[in-house]
Amino acid sequence: MAHPELDLQSMKEWRHAMHQFPELGFEEERTCALVSRSLTEWGYDVHTGLADTGVVGKLVIGTGKGPKLGLRAEMDALPIQEATGLPWQSRVSGKMHACGHDGHTAIMMGAAKALAKMNAAGQLPGNGILHIIFQPAEEIGGGGGAQRMKRKVCSTLS
């Protein structure tokens, strides 16, 4: 199997874009749009609106008959005022990606892009289904986003 080529420049740009416009739990509309648009462009079957702002991209590998694998990233920010002075500092008052979910989402997008490219070139072994899962509202507590996403993903994609 070939090694994936990660688009590090795009990953950096996605992270900075998300960092500048952080969204709290169940408000991840801008992030959802970026993720779903990108996954669609890379050939994923995209499901949006799961647990309000969750996104899942489905990639069929080979015949699709085989194991199912899910990879998950969180998307939400925290209600914190950013004062880092960085060029990509939050532009939204009282909201910040202090938890690193902008990085988590950008890394997962980079992996999704690389895996789709490898799949299109016939470089992924075997047969099965890959689900790339972008979960909203991880920071809300009590498992709100995770539990809602789990119910929706399992019922929608099984």
Feature map (PLM): residue ranges:
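Acidic/His- and Gly-rich active-site-bordering loop/insert found
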Residues: 1-97, 106-129
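Membrane-interface loop-to-helix entry segments
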Residues: 99-101
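Acidic/histidine-rich catalytic neighborhood of metal-dependent amide-processing enzymes
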Residues: 103-158
